[in-house]
């Protein structure tokens, strides 16, 4: 059992920047709009499991999985990623004009915008937005969406937006319980899977 725990921890250390990259990527999707001070509009929290796979054109593949908890009061947000043992591996905290990513080893990345944080963490620009809406079962209105398919209640099931192909399913009152996001970039393909288990 101890050996298995050590193996998991080692794998997470090896893949730490991939996890941090996912954290920054999700934060980049969660740009917080300027809102009047004290407003609770848009407040929500979601949690569950995540898995991210990055496949290089050479066929080399990196993958990491764990848990996520997202707390958002409409102006500030906090996103935690945990390893399979439940330890926090990365945390992103953000507000308009500032975003910070802190890894478990104390490494800190800071940027004016979540998108800049994504570029610093992943090493390439990923101008994404919308996950904040997607987690609620909405297509973001700040970018055009293509190939939109909806269910009988008008909730989006699949669409393309900001370079991502998104599939949403297993809806509850708060939004989709499963999000599968795929993005193809020069030299690599990224697949992110979020399974929500907490409202």
UniProtKB/Swiss-Prot annotation:
GO terms for biological process: lipoprotein localization to outer membrane; protein transport. Keywords: Cell outer membrane, Chaperone, Lipoprotein, Membrane, Palmitate, Protein transport, Signal, Transport. It holds the Pfam family LolB. Gene3D superfamilies: Lipoprotein localisation LolA/LolB/LppX. It is a lipid-anchor. Its main location: membrane. It is found in: Cell outer membrane. A lipid is attached at residue 29 (N-palmitoyl cysteine). Coiled coil: none annotated. The keyword Transmembrane helix does not apply. The keyword Amino-acid biosynthesis does not apply. One of its GO terms (cellular component) is cell outer membrane. A lipid is attached at residue 29 (S-diacylglycerol cysteine). Residues 1-28 form the signal peptide. Belongs to the LolB family. Monomer. Plays a critical role in the incorporation of lipoproteins in the outer membrane after they are released by the LolA protein. This is Outer-membrane lipoprotein LolB. It comes from Bordetella petrii (strain ATCC BAA-461 / DSM 12804 / CCUG 43448).
């Amino acid at each position: 059992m101890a050996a298995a725990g050590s193996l998991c921890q080692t794998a997470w250390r090896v893949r730490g920047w991939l996890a941090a990259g996912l954290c920054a990527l999700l934060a980049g999707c969660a740009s917080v709009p300027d809102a009047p001070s004290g407003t609770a509009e848009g407040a929500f929290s979601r949690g569950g499991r995540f898995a991210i796979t990055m496949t290089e054109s050479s066929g080399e593949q990196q993958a990491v999985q764990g848990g996520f908890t997202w707390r958002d009061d409409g102006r500030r947000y906090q996103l935690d990623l945990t390893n399979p043992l439940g330890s926090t591996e990365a945390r992103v905290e953000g507000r308009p004009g500032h975003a910070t990513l802190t890894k478990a080893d104390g490494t800190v990345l800071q940027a004016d915008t979540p998108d800049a944080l994504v570029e610093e963490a992943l090493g390439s620009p990923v101008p994404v937005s919308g996950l904040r809406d997607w987690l609620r079962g909405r297509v973001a209105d700040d970018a055009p969406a293509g190939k939109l398919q909806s269910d009988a209640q008008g909730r989006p099931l699949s669409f393309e937006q900001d370079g991502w192909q998104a599939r949403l399913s297993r809806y509850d009152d708060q939004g989709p319980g499963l999000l599968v996001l795929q993005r193809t970039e020069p030299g690599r393909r990224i697949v992110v899977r979020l399974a929500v288990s907490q409202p």
